[in-house]
Every structure is written in C-alpha cells, then in structure tokens.
C-alpha cells in the first residue's frame, strides 16, 4: 500500500514506466517488475543510477533515470539470453556435463553480474546444483545455486585448495580460481557430491491441492492477507490435479502460452510463460497436473484472477520413479557400480528398441524434453531405458540427437539393411556389468 501511494518521485516514475499506474501494486509486481529494474543496473555495474532514482526529489529527473533503468533492464535480459544460448550450445555439444551431480559450466567473458541468475535458471532446468564460471583470461569467477537439502557452500569449501576466493551459504555460492583449475574443480566438487549420499532434486513445495471451482477473486483477497511475499515467506503454490487440456493459445509472438483447462465442467485459463508451442509437449485432451501461483490481474479497469504455471506434468507421471531412473542412467554413465535392479531398469530388449524406434519414425522424430517420452510411450519404458536406447541408436547411426536445456531434437536417419543392436557400445558396456 505504501508503494502504491508513495510520494517518492523515483518510485512514482518507476511504477509508471513499469506499466503499473492506476493498479494496486502487489508483492508480485514488486518482485518481478519493479525490483528487477532496480537490480539490473547493479548487475551491470551502474548501481549509482538506482541510488539517484530513489533519492531524487525532482520528478523530471526521476522520469529520465527510470527510463534509463528500463533500458538497462532490457540489456540485462539480452545478456542473459545470449549466455543461456551459449550454455545450451555447450550442453548439446557435450551432454555428459549434465550427468554430473553438480553441473559446472564455464565460458569466456560471460558478464559476471548475471552469472548467478544464469546458474539459477540452469538449476531449474535440471533440478541439480549448478555453478556457472566466467573465464577472464587466466582468472575465472563463478556463481552457484543449490537445491534444498544440499549444502553447496560445504562442497565448494571442500575444494578450497583449488580456489583463490570462496564464500556463500547452503543455497548460493561465489568463487574465484585460476582458469586452468576448472577441470580439476569440476572433478573434486563432484567427488564431494558422490560421497554425500543420495542427492536431493529441486522441488516445488505445494501448499495444498486446489479445486478449480474455488479459484476466484475472494480467494485472491484472502491470500493477499499473507503478503508481502519474499524470502522467508514464499508465494504460495497450489496443485491443480487431473485437469483436462482444452486449448493452447500462443501469445507475444509465441513466447508465452495461454492454456485452457477444465475439470468437472469448471474451466480456467492459465499462463505458461517463456514456453513456445514448439517447446510444449502436451496435446489437447490430455490430463495434466499443474503447480500454480495465483494473483490479481488488472487490465483496462477489469479485475480477474491470474493463474501462473510454475510446473506441469502428465497426471500419469510417477515423478519419483522417473528421477530414480534418471539417477540410475547418470550413475551408469559416470562409471558408478549399480545393483542388479538398477541395471534392470536400464537394460532394454529388442521389443523396447522396436517400441521407441517405431514411435520416433511414425512421428518424424521428436522435439521435446526426453523425459516426456516416458508419457508418450504410455509408461511402458523407464526414463533410463529410453536414454540407453537413444544412445545406442545414436551410436548405430539410426538417429541424430541434440539435447539442450529445454528440448531434445531427435531425427531419424535413413537405414540400409539390418542393424545389430547388440553391437552398440553402450549395450556392450551394460552387458559386461550385468
């Protein structure tokens, strides 16, 4: 309320330039619209602009600085997109990087003010601790983000002999080291993770299951009593289960999606930001589970409920089983000894090969996250088994595969004659240890 009714010229100008004039400023608006503009200039090394904006008593000066902050924030976003594209390319060229328990990715001259934000986004994509390192000649600086339950600072401190500076807390770290020590650092920090025990995955804490019939402005008004949200008081996340997908509408040049969903004749719309139709694997008619935030949306004087999708999965997906299977595959790739049940989870037979190959051929390949293939094949193959088959088919030149942060591109190649599936190196390796 104090921000909505502020008499500070800087905040007034920033509210106007953020498109919030005449609206009630919520903690969500502050977190995702106002604060990023203030933080952006600090990340770009121009923090004096934010200080001047907040201290000025002159509205004209505030309006000018606020406009600059919006431009700087757009520049920060462009820098982030550029680095994320480079990281996606690195992962596509060397997919084994993401088999590590702690993902360590490095690049040349990445802007050090944003690598922490980048680490957080890569962590969201893979559900693992991530450290992003920027090399500036012989010196490198890194920033990391962890998942709940894994003390990333302890892992970093265990590598102190390779570092020139380090600091942080269980969920975030910063560090410096000589560029030549990055490979040794990657190995050593993953040795720490290997000795840690079962690694936790990133997770979303659901406050409660929500009946879509109760999504209305009265609920939003009740939730507003818990604001402001932030550190120590996170925005509540609700679970919408067994929702039927009715329609998919691309927005903003296909950068975002509006989903129409229903259950028991109750229909709602939900926003899936930063996802295009090409990246969305689900089809109309499928039954989905969603983790969502709820907020008030004000537009042209109309007030409605905004449902924002944080994550989405098929209702028939056994997430724990899928993650355990992913761990089995990654441990196998890293040479870790597996027991017989874990190996059985990975070992395919000819029928398994045929099932996946027929699916890929009949659909002209595949262009979504590999994990969603489990659902597309009606849970007949485990995630680990799918990964083994894909790698075997790649080795035998049956397919080409490029796996990035958000999507996998699988293309079926022309084949002459019969192919001996048992000759694939990954199958031979599995047979040896089985």
Features from the language model and the residues they span:
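Hydrophobic helix-and-loop "lid/oligomerization" segment in the mid-to-C-terminal part
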Residues: 1-184, 251
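Mid-to-C-terminal polyanion-binding domains and interfaces
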Residues: 61-65, 71-105, 158-434
């Amino acid at each position: 309320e104090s921000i909505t009714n502020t008499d500070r010229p800087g905040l007034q100008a920033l509210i106007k330039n953020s498109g919030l004039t005449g609206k009630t400023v919520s903690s969500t608006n502050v977190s995702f619209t106002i604060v990023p503009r203030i933080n952006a200039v600090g990340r770009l090394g121009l923090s004096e602009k934010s200080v001047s904006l907040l201290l000025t008593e002159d509205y004209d000066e505030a309006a000018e600085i606020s406009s600059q902050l919006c431009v700087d924030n757009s520049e920060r976003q462009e820098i982030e997109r550029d680095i994320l594209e480079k990281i996606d390319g690195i992962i596509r060229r060397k997919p084994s990087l993401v088999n590590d328990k702690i993902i360590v990715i490095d690049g040349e001259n990445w802007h050090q003010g944003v690598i922490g934000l980048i680490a957080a986004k890569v962590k969201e994509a893979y559900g693992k601790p991530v450290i992003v390192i920027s090399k500036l000649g012989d010196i490198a600086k890194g920033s990391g983000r962890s998942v709940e339950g894994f003390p990333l600072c302890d892992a970093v401190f265990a590598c102190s002999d390779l570092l020139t500076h380090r600091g942080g807390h269980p969920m975030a770290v910063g560090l410096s080291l000589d560029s030549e020590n990055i490979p040794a650092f990657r190995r050593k920090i993953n040795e720490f993770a290997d000795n840690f025990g079962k690694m936790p995955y990133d997770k979303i804490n659901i406050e409660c299951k929500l009946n879509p019939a109760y999504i209305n402005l009265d609920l939003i008004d009740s939730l507003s009593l818990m604001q402001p949200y932030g550190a120590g008081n996170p925005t509540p996340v609700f679970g919408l289960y067994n929702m039927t997908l009715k329609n998919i509408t691309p927005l903003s040049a296909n950068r975002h999606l509006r989903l129409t969903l229903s259950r028991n004749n109750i229909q709602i719309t939900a926003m899936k930001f930063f996802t295009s139709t090409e990246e969305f694997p689900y089809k109309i008619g499928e039954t989905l589970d969603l983790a969502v935030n709820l907020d008030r949306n004000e537009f042209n004087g109309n007030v409605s409920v905004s449902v924002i999708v944080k994550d989405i999965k098929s209702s028939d997906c056994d997430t724990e089983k899928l993650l355990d299977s992913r761990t089995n595959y990654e441990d196998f790739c890293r040479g870790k000894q597996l027991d017989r049940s874990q190996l059985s989870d990975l070992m395919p037979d000819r029928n398994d090969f045929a099932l996946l190959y027929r699916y890929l051929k009949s659909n002209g390949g595949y262009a979504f996250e590999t994990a969603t293939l489990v659902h597309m094949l009606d849970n007949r193959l485990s995630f680990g088994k799918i990964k083994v088959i894909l790698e075997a088919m790649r080795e035998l030149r049956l397919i080409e595969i490029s796996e990035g942060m958000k999507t996998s591109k699988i293309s079926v190649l022309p084949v002459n004659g019969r192919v001996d599936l048992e000759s694939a190196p990954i199958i031979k390796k599995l047979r040896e240890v089985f």
